[in-house]
Amino acid sequence: MRAHTVILGAGATMAAIPNGDRYGKKSSVMNGMISKLGLDDLLVDVELETKSENIEDIYSELCMKHEYVDVVIELEKRLYDYFDSFEIPVPPTVYDFLILSLTEKDVIATFNWDPLLLQAYVRCNEITNNLPHLL
């Protein structure tokens, strides 16, 4: 049988926890993320040229302006802390079903910042060890 490669992005996190994580904490797609995660206070004294609400556009502009290095560091820290605190819900998620539908010949590559895929992987490992590789 042929190997499968599955690439996951922000939409996968949204699909995995549409009602929030184990404690109701919500995720966000890139557009509007700053507001949805309550990070607006970081940009109060920042003058952005971009009119985009996409965090990738905002982050790119902040990184190009040396006067905002402290804002970038704080934004990175708060984003990391926010996503790192997610806990997978008790009922199986789409991550569980995806992992269990693949085998050790397959690969799941993710660009997500949260630990949900890894948490689902650990949970699925209690059922079988014939699991896909994670990148």
For the regions a protein language model found, what residue spans apply to each?
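Gly/serine-rich nucleotide phosphate-binding loop at the start of the catalytic core
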Residues: 1-120, 125-129
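Acidic, His- and aromatic-enriched active-site or binding-groove loops in soluble protein domains
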Residues: 130-135
